[in-house]
Amino acid sequence: GLVGSEMCIRDRHTIVLEGGILCPGFVDAHIHLESSLVTPKEFVRATLPHGTTTVITDPHEITNVMGTDGIDYMFQATEGLPIDVRFMLPSCVPATPMDESGANLDYRAIDSFYDYPRVQGLAEMMNSYGVIHNDPEVVSKIVASQAHHKKIDGHAPGLQGKDLDTYVAAGVYSDHECATMEDALAKLQRGQFIMIREGTAARNLEALAPLLTPQY
């Protein structure tokens, strides 16, 4: 008989659509949901009709104001919504040491949140200087995320050379801030995933479109 003719694929789970329509949805891989200035429920009302079915949000803005209470609120407010809301935990609260924010979160403050099933990892590590120069608090946050087998998003526009080598080697696996092909290629060559954005505030599709070839 034909090679593989004895192979059989068995379903594990069957969903009866009962006349429904099955279609793919968009995934927004990086967002600060609270930046929309509406509640998560209202955000879903605006985005779901346009095909967005999953968002991965970093609640660092509300956390800069409310501390861990802000994270708790976002978890509760996104339960049971028709959009799948996943979380990356804020890595830089405050965003800089000069900020007068409502909270100062070290790795201990966010560590327990890794047990939440919708948490995917550590959000954009904006403190590239701290990563490169082995800042103990920054390293502790990275190590804690890795200990939970979670991903670490990056935020390092224009970082090059040995500094970029160090940043990526620390475990930062993605970047959404590439504005030029040179920047994107340097990070791709080191194994990072590159996000292409064409939204209201950030647009790099035209600059990075040449990446969308079989070569890359």
Which residues fall in each region the model found?
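Active-site mouth loops of central-metabolism enzymes
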Residues: D28-T39, P94-Y107, Y173, E177
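A structural micro-motif
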Residues: R12-H13, G20, I83, K150, ...
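Acidic-and-aromatic substrate-binding clefts and catalytic sites of carbohydrate-active enzymes
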Residues: S36-V38, T63-V65, A201-A202
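Short, small-residue-biased leader/transition segments that mark boundaries at the very start
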Residues: L2-I9
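Active-site neighborhood of phospho(di)ester-bond hydrolases with catalytic His/Asp-centered motifs
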Residues: C23-H30, T57-H60, M88, A123, ...
